[in-house]
From Swiss-Prot:
SUPFAM superfamilies listed in its UniProt record: Cullin homology domain, Cullin repeat-like, Winged helix' DNA-binding domain
Pathway in which this enzyme or protein is active: Protein modification; protein ubiquitination
Source taxonomy: Eukaryota, Fungi, Dikarya, Ascomycota, Saccharomycotina
Cross-link Glycyl lysine isopeptide (Lys-Gly) (interchain with G-Cter in NEDD8) placement: 688
Post-translational modification: Neddylated; enhancing the ubiquitin-ligase activity.
Subunit and partners: Component of a ubiquitin-protein ligase complex consisting of the cullin CUL3, the linker protein ELC1, the substrate receptor ELA1, and the RING protein HRT1.
This protein's name: Cullin-3
Short name of one Pfam family: Cullin_Nedd8
PROSITE patterns: CULLIN_1, CULLIN_2
Keyword Ubl conjugation: yes
Function: As part of the CRL3 E3 ubiquitin ligase complex; polyubiquitylates monoubiquitylated RNA polymerase II subunit RPO21 to trigger its proteolysis; plays a role in global genomic repair.
Keywords assigned: Isopeptide bond, Ubl conjugation, Ubl conjugation pathway
Length: 744
C-alpha cells in the first residue's frame, strides 16, 4: 500500500564493506526500486539502501549510478506505456489510467529522490545534472507523455466537449482533468510546460471550433440569440474555472468573446440595442453593454444607441409651412424635448464605466445625447434654432395663464436649454430669441422672474457673449418698472383719464430700429403730447445727460369706449390709436383729413383705417361714400364676446416704400454695427495678448474665437480693424502694412 508518510533516513555511521563491488551495490539499489514500484516496502531497509548509495557516490561511482538508474527507469516507464496504450479502449478510461499512473509515478519518484539525496548533493549539483526527482519527471515526460500525447490530448478534448454538450458540470470529470492539467503544467522541456506548448493551443482551437458550431444566429431572434450566448458563456466560465488556471481561463474567455460576440452578435448588436431601447429595458441594455469589457465593443453598442436616438429624432417631422409655422415649431420642439428628456432619463440608469467617447471621458450619457442632437441639428440648418426659440416663447407665454403649472413649465424650459447648447446655428437662435423676448417684455406676455431665470440658464450653455444684451433688456424692464412707480406718484402725471406706463430702453440692446421715420412728424393728440412732455421733464431732472427719443412704432395704447352693445377696452398700435382718438372731436373723416390732422403718410393711414373698418373682430369704424369720397366714422353697433379687443399691432405699420427702405436699411445697419463692436472687442483682446500679428494670423485667431458665435465676413473684419486703427487701439507696421501692432 502506498503511504504518504515521510521517510526519514539518517546518515550512516560506517561505510560498510568498502570492497563491495558496484554491481552488487547496484543490485541492492535496483531491488529497492523494484519494491518501491511494486509498493512492497514493508521489508525494505531504507537505511541499508541509503548506505549503499552513499558508498557508491563516495567511491566516485556517481556518474555510473546516475546513468544506470536513468536506463532502468526508462525500461520501467516503457513497460508501463505499452500497457497503457494496449488498454486504451475508451477516452474516459484512458484519462483515468493516465491520471492514476501520474499520481503513482510521482510517489515513486519522490521516494527514489529521497534515497538519492546524497547523490543529488555531491554529484548532480556540482556537475550540473538534473536532480534525481527532476530526472524522473523528465523521463516521464519523454517516455509517457510525449509518446502518448496525441491520444491524451484527443481523449481530453473529446471528454471536455462531451461535458459541454451535456450542459452540466460533472465534478468527477473536472477533477480528473485537473489532475492531468496539473501534470502537463508540471512537465517542462527547454521551451515551456507541455500544457502551454502542446495542449493549450489545441484546447483554444477546439473551443473556437466548438462554439462556432454551437449556435446559428439566423435561426433565432436577436433576444433568443443573446439569451443563448449568455447561457453558453456562463456555462463555459463555470466549467473552465473548475480545472484551468486563471490565465488559461481568461484566454478561453477571449475566444468566446471573439466567436460569440464579434463572430455571432456583431451583425445584430444594433438590432439588440434598438429592441432594448424600444421597450425601455435598462437591464437588457446593461446586459448587452456588459457582454464585453473591450472598448471597441462598448463603443459599438454606444454607436447603436446613438443610431436609435437619431432615427427617432429624424422621424419627428418639421412640417415646414407658413400657415401654421408657429404651431409646427411648438409641436416639433415639444417632441424633441420629450425625446431628449426620456432618453437622458433612460441612459442615466446605465453604467457605462470608463469608456472613452470622442477622446473624452466623463458622463457618457450626456456625451451620447450631445453627439446625436448636435449632429442632427447641424444637418437641419437654421430650422432647429428657429423652432426651439419659438417653443421657449410659447412656454414663457404660458406662465401668464391663470392655471399655469410653473414647475412643469420651468422643467420644459430647463430641458430645452440643454438642446439650445447643442445648436449649430447659435447666432440665429440668439437673433430670434431676442426679438421674441422683446415682444414678451414690451407686451407683458410673460413673468419677468421666469425670463431672468431662463436667461441665466441660457448663459450657462452659451456663455456671456450670447446673453449680455438679453440681460440689458431685462434690466431696462426692471428699471422702467421702478421709474413708472415713481412717475405715478409725481405731480407731473396728473392728467385726468390718462394712464401712462413708459418703457425706457437701451437703444443698442433691443432687436429693432430705434426710430421710425413716421415718428418724426406725427401729430399726437394734445393729452398724449402733454403727458410725453411731462415725462421728458421728469426724466431730464433725474438723468441730466441722457436724451430720450420716442419710438411710437413700439408702443401700445389702450382706449376704453362705450358702444351700443356695451363698454370695451380696445388695444391699438399708437398710430391706429391716434387716428381713433380723432373721432372724439369729429363725427366723420376722410383719409385726406386724417392725414392732415395726424401727418401719418397717406398710404399708412389707408392701411390702418382699413384694418379698423374691415377686420370682423375689430370693426370699430364704418365707412360711407358720398359724392365718390370715402368717409369713416365710429361704428357704435360694434360688438364682441370679449370685453378686451385687440386691433392687430403693427410694429412698422405698412409704411411707404421710401420709409420701408429707410427702416430696413436702419435695421441692417444696426445689426452690422453690433457685430463690428463685438468683433472689435475680440480683436483688442487678441492684440493685447500677442502684441504683433500679421493680417492672416489675426484673421485665423479671430475666426477661431468667433466660429461658435457668428459668421465672420471680410467686410466686417475690415470695418473692425479700420475702427480700431482710427481709435488708436492698433496701428499698421510702417515697413510692412500687412502687420498690426497693439498700442498700449
Amino acid at each position: 500500500m502506498i503511504t504518504n508518510k515521510k521517510i526519514k533516513i539518517s546518515v550512516p555511521e560506517k561505510l560498510g564493506l568498502s570492497e563491495e563491488s558496484f554491481e552488487e551495490s547496484w543490485e541492492t539499489v535496483k531491488y529497492a526500486i523494484d519494491h518501491i514500484y511494486s509498493d512492497d516496502m514493508a521489508d525494505l531497509s531504507f537505511e541499508q539502501v541509503y548506505k549503499t548509495i552513499y558508498t557508491i557516490v563516495l567511491n566516485k561511482k556517481g556518474p555510473i549510478l546516475y546513468n544506470r538508474l536513468k536506463d532502468y527507469l526508462i525500461q520501467k516507464l516503457a513497460l508501463l506505456r505499452e500497457t497503457i496504450v494496449k488498454d486504451n479502449t475508451h477516452d474516459y478510461e484512458f484519462l483515468g489510467t493516465m491520471a492514476r499512473l501520474w499520481e503513482v509515478q510521482c510517489h515513486c519518484f519522490k521516494i527514489t529522490g529521497d534515497l538519492m539525496m546524497y547523490m543529488d548533493k555531491v554529484y548532480c549539483k556540482p556537475n550540473r545534472c538534473m536532480e534525481v526527482y527532476d530526472m524522473c519527471l523528465d523521463l516521464f515526460r519523454i517516455e509517457i507523455l510525449q509518446k502518448c500525447s496525441s491520444s491524451l490530448i484527443s481523449a481530453l478534448i473529446s471528454d471536455i466537449e462531451r461535458i459541454r454538450n451535456l450542459g452540466s458540470v460533472d465534478s468527477e470529470h473536472t477533477s480528473l482533468w485537473k489532475v492531468l492539467i496539473g501534470m502537463m503544467e508540471t512537465l517542462h522541456d527547454n521551451r515551456d510546460s507541455f500544457f502551454l506548448t502542446d495542449f493549450e493551443p489545441v484546447l483554444i482551437s477546439a473551443t473556437e471550433e466548438y462554439y462556432n458550431k454551437a449556435i446559428d444566429i439566423e435561426l433565432l431572434t436577436p433576444i433568443e440569440s443573446l439569451e443563448k450566448i449568455r447561457k453558453l458563456r456562463q456555462f463555459e466560465s463555470m466549467l473552465d474555472s473548475s480545472f484551468l488556471n486563471v490565465d488559461s481561463h481568461n484566454k478561453l474567455k477571449t475566444v468566446l468573446e471573439n466567436v460569440l460576440i464579434w463572430g455571432k452578435l456583431s451583425d445584430i448588436i444594433e438590432d439588440l440595442t434598438h429592441e432594448a431601447m424600444v421597450i425601455s429595458n435598462g437591464k437588457l441594455l446593461q446586459e448587452i453593454y456588459d457582454l464585453s469589457s473591450e472598448e471597441k465593443y462598448r463603443v459599438t453598442v454606444i454607436e447603436s444607441i446613438k443610431s436609435y436616438i437619431n432615427k427617432n429624432a429624424i422621424n419627428i417631422p418639421f412640417n415646414e409651412g407658413n400657415r401654421k409655422k408657429g404651431q409646427n415649431a411648438i409641436t416639433w420642439s415639444s417632441e424633441i424635448v420629450e425625446l431628449y428628456r426620456s432618453q437622458h432619463s433612460f441612459l442615466e440608469s446605465i453604467d457605462f464605466g470608463s469608456v472613452r467617447l470622442n477622446n473624452l471621458t466623463g458622463d457618457v450619457s450626456n456625451a451620447i445625447l450631445g453627439d446625436v442632437f448636435s449632429m442632427y441639428f447641424s444637418k437641419e440648418g437654421a430650422l432647429p434654432s428657429e423652432y426651439l426659440s419659438t417653443y421657449v416663447d410659447h412656454c414663457m407665454k404660458r406662465t401668464k395663464e391663470k392655471d399655469a403649472e410653473i414647475v412643469k413649465i420651468k422643467q420644459d424650459l430647463l430641458d430645452s436649454t440643454k438642446l439650445i447648447g447643442l445648436l449649430t446655428e447659435k447666432d440665429i437662435f440668439e437673433k430670434i430669441y431676442k426679438k421674441q423676448l422683446s415682444r414678451r417684455l414690451l407686451q407683458q406676455r410673460s413673468l419677468v422672474e421666469i425670463e431672468k431665470w431662463m436667461v441665466q440658464m441660457i448663459k450657462k450653455v452659451l456663455g456671456t457673449f450670447f446673453t449680455s444684451k438679453l440681460e440689458i433688456m431685462l434690466r431696462d424692464i426692471s428699471l422702467s418698472s421702478e421709474m413708472y412707480q415713481a412717475f405715478q406718484h409725481s405731480t407731473i402725471n396728473s392728467i385726468e383719464y390718462l394712464s401712462f406706463a413708459p418703457q425706457v430702453l437701451t437703444r443698442t440692446s433691443w432687436p429693432f430700429q430705434s426710430t421710425n421715420p413716421i415718428d418724426e412728424g406725427i401729430s399726437l393728440p394734445p393729452r398724449m403730447s402733454q403727458i410725453l412732455a411731462g415725462f421728458e421733464g421728469y426724466y431730464s431732472l433725474k438723468y441730466k445727460e441722457r436724451v430720450l427719443k420716442w419710438a411710437h412704432h413700439l408702443s401700445v395704447i389702450e382706449i376704453g369706449c362705450q358702444f351700443n352693445s356695451g363698454y370695451y377696452e380696445i388695444s391699438f398700435s399708437v398710430y391706429a390709436g391716434v387716428i381713433f382718438l380723432l373721432f372724439e372731436d369729429y363725427e366723420e373723416l376722410t383719409l385726406g383729413e386724417i392725414y392732415e390732422l395726424t401727418h401719418i403718410p397717406i398710404d399708412d393711414v389707408k392701411s390702418l383705417v382699413m384694418s379698423m373698418s374691415t377686420i370682423p373682430r375689430c370693426k370699430i369704424l364704418k365707412k360711407s361714400s358720398s359724392s365718390g369720397n370715402m368717409k369713416f366714422s365710429v361704428n357704435y353697433f360694434f360688438s364682441s364676446p370679449n370685453r378686451k379687443v385687440k386691433v392687430p399691432v403693427i410694429a412698422c405699420p405698412l409704411p411707404s416704400q421710401k420709409s420701408d427702405n429707410l427702416a430696413t436699411a436702419s435695421s441692417v445697419d444696426t445689426y452690422d454695427n453690433e457685430i463690428v463692436m463685438e468683433l472689435s472687442a475680440i480683436i483688442v483682446r487678441i492684440m493685447k495678448t500677442e502684441g504683433k500679428l500679421s493680417h492672416q494670423q489675426l484673421l485665423e485667431r479671430t475666426t477661431k474665437r468667433t466660429q461658435s458665435r457668428l459668421s465672420l465676413t471680410p467686410s466686417i473684419l475690415k470695418r473692425s480693424i479700420q475702427l480700431l486703427i482710427e481709435k488708436e487701439y492698433i496701428q499698421r507696421n510702417a515697413d510692412d502694412p500687412s502687420y498690426y501692432h497693439y498700442l498700449s
